[in-house]
Amino acid sequence: MRLLVFLILLIFVNFSFANVRPNGRRFSESQYRTAFTEWTLKFNRQYSSSEFSNRYSIFKSNMDYVDNWNSKGDSQTVLGLNNFADITNEEYRKTYLGTRVNAHSYNGYDGREVLNVEDLQTNPKSIDWRTKNAVTPIKDQGQCGSCWSFSTTGSTEGAHALKTKKLVSLSEQNLVDCSGPEENFGCDGGLMNNAFDYIIKNKGIDTESSYPYTAETGSTCLFNKSDIGATIKGYVNITAGSEISLENGAQHGPVSVAIDASHNSFQLYTSGIYYEPKCSPTELDHGVLVVGYGVQGKDDEGPVLNRKQTIVIHKNEDNKVESSDDSSDSVRPKANNYWIVKNSWGTSWGIKGYILMSKDRKNNCGIASVSSYPLA
């Protein structure tokens, strides 16, 4: 370890970095050096001599961005030098964001049945499916744009667990390799509803242990029906753009959602309730999993009574769904409300792999624009 520290510092000397703060920089060169050295040790980064200078320069820019964001003190979102601190935002978007959908033109309701229900529904102030044995541990998609597959397995794992009382980790690789006919593209992106269609047509999805993840699009589908870990009979599309609808949907289990995760603030998120004013509610590029919601601090409104509920379900063998989803607006305090969101970037990102995303703040980052959950 001491030798590695010495070699890293020696590289800095060889690059002849001056200990002077250039215009536009927020730290001295020695502060950048110390931070980068500690960061490379923490995340076990090793670079070639030709790559070192570029990664160090990117790290400094990200370090400036983090400090500028956090120093404003007007946000509940806390950024940090996480495992993505040595890549540009362009690299990050190209490598890790694999859901491509425009909520304005999305036709996910085509061929689905719409049920309008006039009813009342009282939801609890918070729910967390992790405490009900319906959420598997954090996974890591690696350098593959397969986020959509992790969102799909996550909601399917939850639905299966709540029905059978058995939590089984399901195979993302099965979806990556085999759901091309449903218009998914492996590591180059896909959609959760397309993956649900595959599971329905395929009459199941394999377990993760039988079909392990490789972070590559396989040339051959290796699905084996003897290794099926779960089946679904349909899925519910939640009313687009309504966070109350999403809250109602979350009463049934984890929900697959698409979000705008393109910003530096999401890339470098560390803790707090995430809110990004620049987020788009329609240009969505990342598939994640809502596993619950809650409120930080005092909630003086209590449970919300919802009306004008609408369900959109997948037509499949005369499926009937008794639950309903609302399209009205929330009346709870907004700034401290959050969604509990499971990501697929390992435990080094965010809050041990999770992010708390703003809830009831005009559908920030499009979290309620395209959302659905499977029926086990």
Swiss-Prot record:
Q: Which residues form the active site?
A: C147, H286, N343
- PANTHER family (UniProt xref): CYSTEINE PROTEASE FAMILY C1-RELATED
> SMART domains, per this entry?
Inhibitor_I29, Pept_C1
Its main subcellular localisation, reduced to a broad class, is other
The organism is: Dictyostelium discoideum
Q: Which GO terms describe its cellular component?
A: extracellular space; lysosome
User: What Gene Ontology molecular-function terms does this entry list?
Assistant: cysteine-type endopeptidase activity
Q: What is this protein called?
A: Cysteine proteinase 2
Superkingdom assignment: Eukaryota
Q: What is the residue range of the signal peptide feature? A: 1-18
The record describes the protein's role as:
Cysteine proteinases 1 and 2 are believed to participate in the breakdown of protein during differentiation of Dictyostelium as a response to starvation.
Q: Give yes or no: UniProt keyword Glycoprotein.
A: no
Q: Which gene encodes it?
A: cprB
Q: What does the record give as EC number?
A: 3.4.22.-
